[in-house]
C-alpha cells in the first residue's frame, strides 16, 4: 500500500516588524508599501515620497503604538500566529494526516521564502496555502499568491499545490463568528462589522473585496437574527488622501451617538488574528473616539485567534483539499 504523501501547510498572513523600533518598522513598512499589490503608484513618484517623508514620520509614530502592545513573544500577531500553528498541527495530527504546518508572512518574518524552504527541506510532496484572509482582496490574498510563487520560482521540480482563495461564506467560519458574537453581545448593543478598507479605485479595477465583506456580514446577521437597525458594516485603516471604501469606521463612530446609538460592540471579521489594527486602532483609538462623542459603552469583540472553532475551521479547509 502506498504511503500517503506528506503535506505542507502554509498559514499565511500579512506580517509584523521584528521589533518595536523605528528602524525595524521602517524596514517592514518599506517591504509592505513597495508591493504594487498594496500601492500601485509609479515607482518614480512613490519611492522618493516614501523614503523622504512617509517612512520617517510613520515609523516613529507606529513604533510607540507597537511598544504599547508588544509582548515577550513578540508582536501579538506573531505570538498568536504561533499558537494557531501549534493548534492546527495538533488538530491535523489527530486526524492522522502527515502534515507540517508553517507560518508564512508576506512581509517580515517568518517569511514566505523561509517557510517554503522548511517544507521543501523536509520533503513534503504537496503544499496547501491558507491565506488567513476570509474575504479575497488583491492587496492581501493576491499578495500572498505572489509571495508564494516568488518563493518557488527557482524550483525546477514544482510541487503540486492548492491555494485556498477565500472562505468568506464557509459554514464553519460563519458559525465560529456567530458563536463568538453570541456569547459577548448584549441585548441593548448595536453591532458594528468593521473591515480593513482598500482604495475605492481598486474596486473599480475589479477587486470584489467589498462584495465578500457584505456576504460575510449578511450571513452572520441572518445567523444571529438581527434586524436592519441593529447592525452596520464599515471600513477602517484608510491610508493616504484618495477615497477608500465607505462608510469609514472612525467617521461612523464619531456620529453614532447622534444617531441614538449609545452602546456598541465592534467586531472585525476580516482579521483572523488580533494585531495593531484591532488592538490599538479599534479597541483603543476608536473606543475613545466613540465615548468622547457621546457614546455610553463600547465593546471590542476579539478576533477568532485560537478559539477551538477557528482552528477546527482551518483544519476542515485543509481536509477538504485532501478529499
From Swiss-Prot:
Catalyzes the ferrous insertion into protoporphyrin IX. It catalyses: heme b + 2 H(+) = protoporphyrin IX + Fe(2+). Belongs to the ferrochelatase family. Its main location: cytoplasm. The keyword Iron applies. It is found in: Cytoplasm. This is Ferrochelatase. Keywords: Cytoplasm, Heme biosynthesis, Iron, Lyase, Metal-binding, Porphyrin biosynthesis. HAMAP family: Ferrochelatase. It is an enzyme of class 4 (lyase). Pfam families: Ferrochelatase. Pathway: Porphyrin-containing compound metabolism; protoheme biosynthesis; protoheme from protoporphyrin-IX: step 1/1. GO terms for molecular function: ferrochelatase activity; metal ion binding. Its EC number is 4.98.1.1. It comes from Haemophilus influenzae (strain ATCC 51907 / DSM 11121 / KW20 / Rd). Fe cation binds at residues 196, 277. The keyword RNA-binding does not apply. GO terms for cellular component: cytoplasm. One of its GO terms (biological process) is heme biosynthetic process. NCBIfam families: hemH (TIGR00109).
Amino acid at each position: 500500500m502506498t504511503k500517503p504523501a506528506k503535506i505542507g501547510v502554509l498559514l499565511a498572513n500579512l506580517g509584523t516588524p521584528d521589533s518595536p523600533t523605528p528602524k525595524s518598522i521602517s524596514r517592514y513598512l518599506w517591504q509592505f508599501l513597495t508591493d504594487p499589490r498594496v500601492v500601485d503608484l509609479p515607482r518614480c513618484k512613490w519611492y522618493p515620497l516614501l523614503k523622504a517623508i512617509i517612512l520617517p514620520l510613520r515609523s516613529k509614530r507606529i513604533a510607540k503604538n507597537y511598544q504599547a502592545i508588544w509582548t515577550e513573544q513578540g508582536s501579538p500577531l506573531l505570538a498568536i500566529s504561533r499558537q494557531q500553528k501549534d493548534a492546527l498541527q495538533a488538530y491535523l495530527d489527530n486526524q492522522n494526516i502527515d502534515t507540517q504546518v508553517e507560518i508564512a508572512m508576506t512581509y517580515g518574518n517568518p517569511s514566505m521564502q523561509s517557510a517554503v524552504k522548511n517544507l521543501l527541506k523536509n520533503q513534503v510532496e504537496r503544499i496547501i496555502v491558507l491565506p488567513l484572509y476570509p474575504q479575497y482582496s488583491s492587496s492581501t490574498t493576491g499578495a500572498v499568491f505572489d509571495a508564494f510563487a516568488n518563493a518557488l520560482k527557482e524550483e525546477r521540480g514544482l510541487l503540486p499545490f492548492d491555494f485556498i482563495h477565500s472562505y468568506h461564506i464557509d459554514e464553519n467560519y460563519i458559525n465560529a463568528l456567530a458563536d463568538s458574537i453570541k456569547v459577548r453581545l448584549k441585548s441593548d448593543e448595536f453591532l458594528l462589522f468593521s473591515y480593513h478598507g482598500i482604495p475605492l479605485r481598486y474596486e473599480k479595477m475589479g477587486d470584489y473585496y467589498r462584495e465578500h465583506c457584505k456576504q460575510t456580514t449578511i450571513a452572520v446577521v441572518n445567523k444571529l437574527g438581527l434586524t436592519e437597525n441593529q447592525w452596520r458594516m464599515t471600513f477602517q485603516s484608510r491610508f493616504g488622501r484618495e477615497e477608500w471604501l465607505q462608510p469609514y469606521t472612525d467617521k461612523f463612530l464619531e456620529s453614532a451617538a447622534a444617531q441614538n446609538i449609545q452602546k456598541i460592540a465592534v467586531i472585525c471579521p476580516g482579521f483572523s488574528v488580533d494585531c495593531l489594527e484591532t488592538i490599538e486602532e479599534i479597541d483603543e483609538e476608536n473606543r475613545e473616539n466613540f465615548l468622547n462623542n457621546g457614546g455610553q459603552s463600547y465593546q471590542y469583540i476579539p478576533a477568532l485567534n485560537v478559539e477551538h472553532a477557528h482552528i477546527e475551521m482551518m483544519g476542515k479547509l485543509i481536509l477538504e483539499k485532501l478529499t
